[in-house]
Amino acid sequence: GVNLFYRKKTGVELTPAGLEMQKHCTKIFNSINIMDESIKEYSLVSSGIVRVTANLSSITQFLPEDLSTFSKKFPKIKIKLKEKTSSGVISSVKESLSDIGIFSEHVENTERLRIIDYKSDTLVLVVPEYQPLVSKLTVKIKDFVKFEMVGLEKGSSLQAMIDKQVQKQNLKMKKKLETVSFEGIRGMVEAGLGISVLPTGAIKPYLKSSKLKIIKIDEEWAKRSIKIAIKNDDSIGKAGALLLNHLIS
């Protein structure tokens, strides 16, 4: 063993080894105190309410799992989730009706907001199994807009993106029906009322149990970024900051 102190008539005195041990012990106790303070602060912010507004694509594909894992880590934080179109998400954040907004790119009026990358998705063509295009491995927009289309309501960033490409390429689209949900689109397409464009995550889980097929869209616009919008770091509160960090980690 190593002697840590000398015994003297007047008491004890630390040896050089004892002095070294004292330094390390001081560091350890300081670290414990810092950790204790951090945990106390952590427990204080692990409750509260976070208002989240998100578009249909993110709610369908990504948020269920992300919010589930977050809620398990922070059961005392309540999340109020609303669905809106991407343009509606931006308005909601700007008007301070939401702490965190999740939307698809190519939406206007995002100035004065902090925009953060969240996820990415890929759009595919969805057709019934007997549709003439079903034998193709890939398609371009000019190949499928000639067929009757089932789309989302006005204001949807997905529909706006398709409409923009139709206009950009001087095409004409035969839009037959509009609906408000991916579920509605899947049902309409399976019933033979048209074809549609959906994010991969909104259709892949249903392929085995349906008569639907997907075809890759071989164009750059079919790859999208999903973004997060906040006013600024101070506007979302400590509970909101925990959720934001969880979403982007």
Where are the language model's segments positioned?
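Short beta-strand-centered segments that line the small-molecule binding cleft or hinge
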Residues: 23, 27, 42, 65-69, ...
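N-terminal winged-helix
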Residues: 37, 43-74, 78-82, 87-91, ...
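A short LG(V/I)-centered, amphipathic sequence patch enriched
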Residues: 1-14
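A late-sequence structural motif
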Residues: 62, 213-249
